[in-house]
């Protein structure tokens, strides 16, 4: 072996060792821990908020549930103090949420997911069946309402990267039940990191949540706000707008409500969740 080879071998060994250690560190990295707010006692309702929101958005509805339930409000990754998984995927978000679900009693737990919080819930329950007895989904998109070529998706996402403020305003400035509330929502939404928004939107464009939804063996209660469910639309048309393959499923309409449905209609929404929970827990005891 030449002198040059003797120098090269230790260098290669060190490089290989460093690479192996890097991979090992990634494999054994600490899981993402999501921040939660836990209130009350009794059977558990786990609630995951929407993109651009906070877990405290759900306090008005949570308070209506506290007489009979323990409520766990979960922070969506990339919001507040809960980090965004790297690399990002709904599967990774679901794994982070499962860290919360795994601590609950599966025989007395219902999960509520709002918008992309619903995609997180679907991913978690698809990967870990048996964590809950039922799922309530509020305005949850499973895919795009129409077929779009990957090239067009990429063009839109590139435009979002280059003109984030314009795209964010186009997508998220009309989510309220009226123009005044829409402006308030968008002001709050702008506090969310653009990296978080881009990650969720990109994943929403390129993944299909129907597979997760179809894999679940537990009942799903679908709920739509009146912002989405206009009077002239059928429930099937609403589900199609949200990208659902199954447009025959039952949907409950929440009147006079937008993205802040949990604030707009806390009594009605709590009643829907509570009635669903009662039915599911009763069925589980049979």
Where are these regions (language model features)?
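N-terminal signal peptide c-region/cleavage motif recognized by signal peptidases
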Residues: 23-26
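Conserved HGGG/HGGXW glycine-rich cap/lid loop of the alpha/beta-hydrolase fold
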Residues: 32, 37-83
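Conserved alpha/beta-hydrolase catalytic His-Asp/Glu region
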Residues: 146-147, 159-217
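Conserved loop-alpha-helix segment in the C-terminal half of the alpha/beta-hydrolase fold
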Residues: 220-263
């Amino acid at each position: 072996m030449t002198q040059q080879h003797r120098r090269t071998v230790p260098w290669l060994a060190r490089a290989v060792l460093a690479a192996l250690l890097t991979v090992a560190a990634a494999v054994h990295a600490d899981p993402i821990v999501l921040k939660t707010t836990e209130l009350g006692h009794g059977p558990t309702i786990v609630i995951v908020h929407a993109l651009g929101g906070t877990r405290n958005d759900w306090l008005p509805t949570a308070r209506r549930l506290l007489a009979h339930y323990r409520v766990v409000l979960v922070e969506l990754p990339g919001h507040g103090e809960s980090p965004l998984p790297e690399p990002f995927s709904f599967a990774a978000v679901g794994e982070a949420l499962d860290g919360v679900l795994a601590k609950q009693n599966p025989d007395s737990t219902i999960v509520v997911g709002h918008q992309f919080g619903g995609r997180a819930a679907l991913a978690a329950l698809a990967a870990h069946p048996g964590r809950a007895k039922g799922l309530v989904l509020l305005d949850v998109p499973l895919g795009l309402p129409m077929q779009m070529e990957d090239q067009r998706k990429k063009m839109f996402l590139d435009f979002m990267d280059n003109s984030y403020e314009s795209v964010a305003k186009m997508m998220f400035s009309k989510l309220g039940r009226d123009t005044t509330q829409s402006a308030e929502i968008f002001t709050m939404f702008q506090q969310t990191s653009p990296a978080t928004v881009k990650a969720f939107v990109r994943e929403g464009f390129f993944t299909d949540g129907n597979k997760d939804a179809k894999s679940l063996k537990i009942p799903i209660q679908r709920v739509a706000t009146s912002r989405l469910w206009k009077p002239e639309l059928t429930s099937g048309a609403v589900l199609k707008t949200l990208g659902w393959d199954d447009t025959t499923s039952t949907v409950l309409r929440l009147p006079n409500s937008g993205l802040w449905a949990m604030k707009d209609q806390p009594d009605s929404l709590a009643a829907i969740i509570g009635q669903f929970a009662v039915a599911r827990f009763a069925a589980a005891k049979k």
